[in-house]
Structures are given as structure tokens and as C-alpha cells.
Amino acid sequence: MPLNDLLQNRRSTRRFRPDAPIDRAELNALISQANRASSSNNAQPWRIMVLTDPALRQRLLPEAYGQEQIITASAVLVLLGDRAAYREPNLRRIHQQEFADDCFDANVRDFLIQAAVQFYQPFDETDTQRGLALDCGLWAMAFMLAAEAAGW
């Protein structure tokens, strides 16, 4: 489906068919696609919990403002923002992997690590929460578009 059609037709699903559970392999593929989402300095600060256990979803219900789709969906994804993703060890790991994948040379790698560390260094808790909300929101949109493109 063309991107424009995906964007024009995207809707927030409120009702789920109990006779159409999502296969775990297909769900994992959608998560993998969403993991390619853009993020600030490629920090990739999202962590995903997949809840299929009805008892766990029942416990989550009050935190989700009683939305019945927490119970009726075949799986619930809990999207968490990892504050440690904006710290030097993760930034170094990410850019080292990009270097190993031959995305750029060592000089660019070193520059990107230094620039990212300097960018996040002055972040207070509010800045960190805003960054996580933005980056995790990009992941969520990528996931929704991938799911829509797959017919969900």
C-alpha cells in the first residue's frame, strides 16, 4: 500500500476480533520493522514488552484508563523509554556498530559519538522525558504504519 494511502486511512483501532489473533512471528516482524524508526542520534531508546497473558493485561487495565481493547486485543505492546539509551555507553555502542557495518569511517564515528554525548550531557529529567516521548512516538508511528501495511 502506498505511504500516502497508509497515512490517509490510518485509524486508531478500538475493537478487535477475537477470532483473528496475531501470530507471534508476524508480531515480531512488525516490531523489527518499527525498530528501524528514526531516533535522536540513533539512540534507539525504546524497549517493548509484549503482553498476551490475560491476567497481566487485566492488571494493566487501570493504567490504560479502562480501555477495553487492553483486554480484547490478542497482544498489548507496552512501549518503554530507556533513559540509559542517551548515555555514553549506548551511544558509543550504536555508532561503533554503524562503523562496523561500514556506514562511515572512524573519524565520522568518533565525531558522532562526541557530538551525541555533548548533546545529551546537559539534559535534565524533563529534557530526557521529552526526548523519550519524541523518539518512542516515532517508533509507535512506524509500528502502526507497518501493521496497517500488513493488513492489521
Pin down the residues of each PLM region.
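Acidic, surface-exposed loops and disordered segments
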Residues: M1-W152
